Amino acid sequence: MSLVFDKWELDEVKVEDMGLAKYICLDSILVPHTMGRHVKRQFAKSKVSIVERLINKVMRTERNSGKKNKAYKIVQEAFEIINRRTKENPVQILVKAVENTSPREETTRIKYGGIGYQVAVDISPQRRVDLSLGFITRGAMQAAFKNKKSIEECLANEIMLAAEYDTRSFAIQKKEEKERIARSAH
């Protein structure tokens, strides 16, 4: 049995949101790096480990663009901080944060006769997970920018706040904003 970062088991991690269960991959993997084998098939990224998807989202930001090893170390240290503070499996905390920050509705623009309307639509589970991971990493990057706190601390803090559904979390704020806009478009 392999462990994430050679420390945490994925067997004990549970996904409570049944809509996301199929899209949050918890396969055992020692080093979360698949070298982009999933990009050629449409829904193959749902088979990529949730930890690797978080690493890829951290890597996509301006400062860490293309630096997979740096992003790997950021996520690994953030997981260490989460484990020290909560004494729980950090992958379970991450899964809880993804469940809490994934929006269920958003708006899309539809044109009828040259006039554009905003219409509320349900979000697919794949997009919900993508948006959630994006909100978490963007919140961590914004918290770490021009701040004494390291990116690792900010990422750990953002994940823990999101897992507790704390409104101080950037990801929770963005989720609620997206759902509020969708409700007003009904």
Swiss-Prot record:
Keyword Translocase found: no
Protein name (record): Small ribosomal subunit protein uS7
Entry-linked Gene3D superfamilies: Ribosomal protein S7 domain
GO CC annotations on file: small ribosomal subunit
Family classification: Belongs to the universal ribosomal protein uS7 family.
Functional description taken from the UniProt entry: One of the primary rRNA binding proteins, it binds directly to 16S rRNA where it nucleates assembly of the head domain of the 30S subunit. Is located at the subunit interface close to the decoding center.
GO biological process, one term: translation
